[in-house]
Structures are given as structure tokens and as C-alpha cells.
């Protein structure tokens, strides 16, 4: 055992929870794509997404409970808190986007909605890849690559939003 190993926490619970949260984000994004690929029974599909979101909340609570009772953590407690909150927010925002379909009584999605959902799904997959590399940090270039790809996907989503808004206001009736 090296000197460094004596002072480095060997507990993997946080990394397990990060990976669980990232997997839940992938599940939520896949469910969002499912909603748009077959826009029928939207309420039932949304309830399935809501169940995924509740699973994410439970994982978030476990992570914060663990953080509150762990003295020596593998990362700074503030970093753990930020990562846990950010991963939870991904799922919460996916849930909120799907909920608005029901709130606004969207009867037929436009062509941009599925593209947004697929972009979100790709981002969630990158998050999962990046988070899985945190455990060992043997290849930080993979994490960096995931961050760069997530930024690229954000730019794609920005372009989609611009195109969707342009399309909306070029139609005869921007309300419907």
C-alpha cells in the first residue's frame, strides 16, 4: 500500500451513485425520445418518465445522505454536491419539458421536438461516459472529450431552437 493510498478514500459509494444518476438521465432521455417517436398515449408515457424522475430523486437523496455522514470523501464535498445536483437537474429538466407537453395540450409535436429529444439523449450518453471515467481518472482526456461533445450538442440545440422559433413565427399562426 502506498503512502497516497493511506489518505485516499477507498469507498466507491459516491462513484456508484454518480453512475446510477447518469444511467437514470439516459433512461429519462430515452423515454423522452419514445414520447416523440410515437406521440400516442402521451400521459401514460409521461407517467413512466415521472417514475424515472422519482428514481432519480431517490438516488440524489441517497447521495446527499451519504455526503452528510462521510468524513473523508473521494472528491471535495462541494464538488460532490454540485455534481449530484447537476445530474439531478438533467432529469428534472427532461421531466419538466415532457410535462409542458401536457400543460400546453400539445396534440402534435413539430419536427424540431424529436430532434431536441435526440440531442438530449446524445448529451445524456456523453454524461454517462464522462461520469464512468471519474472513478479512476486514469484517462482525463475521455472526460474532457465528453465535455467538448456536450458543449457541441448544446450548440446544436441552440441552432435547433433558432430554427424552431423562426419556423414558428413564419407560420400563419404562431399560437397554434
Go through each PLM region and give its residues.
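Cytosolic, long alpha-helical scaffolding segments
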Residues: 1-176
Amino acid at each position: 500500500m502506498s503512502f497516497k493510498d493511506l489518505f485516499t478514500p477507498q469507498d466507491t459509494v459516491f462513484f456508484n451513485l454518480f453512475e446510477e444518476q447518469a444511467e437514470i438521465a439516459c433512461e429519462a432521455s430515452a423515454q423522452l425520445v419514445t414520447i416523440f417517436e410515437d406521440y400516442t398515449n402521451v400521459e401514460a408515457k409521461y407517467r413512466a418518465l415521472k417514475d424515472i424522475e422519482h428514481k432519480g430523486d431517490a438516488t440524489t437523496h441517497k447521495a446527499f445522505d451519504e455526503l452528510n455522514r462521510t468524513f473523508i470523501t473521494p472528491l471535495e464535498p462541494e464538488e460532490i454536491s454540485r455534481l449530484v445536483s447537476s445530474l439531478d437537474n438533467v432529469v428534472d429538466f427532461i421531466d419538466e419539458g415532457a410535462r409542458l407537453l401536457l400543460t400546453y395540450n400539445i396534440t402534435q409535436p413539430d419536427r424540431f421536438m424529436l430532434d431536441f429529444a435526440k440531442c438530449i439523449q446524445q448529451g445524456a450518453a456523453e454524461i454517462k461516459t464522462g461520469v464512468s471515467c471519474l472513478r479512476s481518472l486514469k484517462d482525463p482526456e475521455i472526460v474532457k472529450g465528453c465535455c467538448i461533445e456536450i458543449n457541441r450538442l448544446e450548440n446544436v440545440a441552440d441552432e435547433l431552437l433558432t430554427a424552431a422559433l423562426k419556423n414558428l413565427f413564419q407560420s400563419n399562426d404562431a399560437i397554434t
